[in-house]
Amino acid sequence: MGKVYESIDDKLAGWIGRQRLFFVATAPSDGGHVNVSPKGPIDTLTVVDGRTVEYVDHVGSGAETAAHLRENGRICVMLCAFEGPPRIVRLHGRGEVVPAPDPGDGVRAVVRIHVERIADSCGYGVPLMEFVGERPQREAWLAHKGADGLRDYVRDRNAESIDGLPAFSL
């Protein structure tokens, strides 16, 4: 049976910190495409206080999360236990995008989420999986692009969402 929490206490924050990745879900206000994105590694997600989390938003192929947050602020962070006892935790809230001063290092922004609802559920449908390691492609891609290439990439490919909503501007 699921439980609704008043805040993210130390025990829940510890559980969050032991997961390998998290997912964020957003949607535009009217029509458009719902977006669910895997994020990680987990050390990019920080519990700021009992009602606030934030994560580092890396340069990537899409900009839906940022565009949707700029439009309406709605976001849900979901974490699943792929190891140990089954559990899913969802953090529903309002997010804001704090742009990085320079995406040349591979970071576009910090996404800060003011959590309005904290709940868990059984997680029985989540498979047990063994963590092997982080994929090496991201670091290789960043090195290949270089700082100027990353700035160009954000300017050219992250300016708007697939639905044409504004996301990042340089």
Regions found by a protein language model. Give the residues of each.
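Binding-site signature for planar aromatic cofactors or substrates
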Residues: 1-170
